[in-house]
């Protein structure tokens, strides 16, 4: 098996962290990022030979400098996964929450996705993935900015997938739309069809390996996605 150089943006907890662990278990080199230096250092101590890290917040400046630094440390890049995100409920439509959501899930995401896509196009190979959400399908009264931001991510990645195909480059673009995963962000125990984080991470890795354009995690969430997409507004407004 060829060892790959992988960067996971947002890998100190949840799906991102589990993906890093699974990739390491497969013998790959992994670059991780996050806002908390102590958590990054803990992972580095656990896997001193396999892990490199950069500590930064995607809402701040110099995102690309940190990504470039990780590429240098890994001596290359084959796969980049954008897992960083925020999903706080904004029941009272709090602008501070919505602003943070947009800065993280739209601005920070787009800057990294844009730069990485162009990087892969120039080297004529690479796999780019994002952890979006089933929430991308429709609006939600409890977290309007979150669902809107996830819709942006999914639509942006659809555009990148089309662009890569037209450019005839060996670049794959994978959008993952998970349902409820048992992480702190989802507070998964309260919901149905809750997926263990290890299962979710494993399915995502397989989707990236197979160069899938879009996948739902777990797979049966495609049913919910279709129902939501075609659900009349007068029904939707009573549910979410």
Name each model-derived stretch.
Residues 47-62:
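Rossmann-fold cofactor-recognition segment
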Residues 83-89:
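Conserved NAD(P)H cofactor-binding loop of Rossmann-fold oxidoreductase domains
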Residues 133:
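Residue(s) in the substrate-gating loop at a strand-loop-helix junction
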Residues 113, 149:
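Active-site helix of classical SDR
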Residues 12-13:
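Conserved glycine-rich cofactor-binding loop
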Residues 175, 187-226:
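C-terminal helical subdomain
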Residues 90-103:
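Short alpha-helical oligomerization interface
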């Amino acid at each position: 098996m060829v060892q790959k150089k992988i960067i996971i943006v947002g890998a100190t907890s949840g799906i991102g962290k589990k993906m890093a662990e699974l990739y390491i278990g497969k013998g790959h080199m992994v670059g991780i990022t996050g806002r908390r230096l102590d958590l990054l250092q803990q992972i580095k101590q656990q896997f001193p030979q396999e892990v490199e890290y950069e500590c930064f917040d995607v809402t701040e400046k110099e995102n690309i400098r940190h990504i470039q630094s990780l590429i240098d440390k890994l001596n290359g890049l084959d796969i980049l996964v954008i897992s960083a995100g925020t999903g706080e409920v904004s029941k009272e439509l709090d602008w501070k929450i919505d602003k943070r959501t947009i800065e993280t899930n739209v601005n920070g995401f787009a800057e990294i996705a844009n730069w990485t896509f162009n990087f892969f196009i120039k080297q004529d190979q690479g796999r780019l993935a994002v952890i979006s959400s089933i929430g991308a399908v429709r609006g939600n009264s409890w977290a309007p900015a979150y669902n809107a931001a996830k819709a942006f991510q999914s639509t942006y990645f659809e555009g990148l997938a089309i662009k890569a195909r037209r450019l005839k480059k060996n670049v794959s673009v994978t959008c993952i739309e998970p349902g409820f995963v048992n992480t702190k962000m989802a507070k998964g125990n309260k919901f149905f069809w809750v997926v263990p984080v290890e299962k979710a991470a494993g399915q995502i890795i397989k989707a990236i390996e197979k160069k899938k354009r879009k996948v739902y995690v777990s797979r049966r969430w495609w049913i919910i996605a279709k129902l939501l997409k075609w659900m009349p507004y007068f029904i939707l407004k009573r549910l979410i």
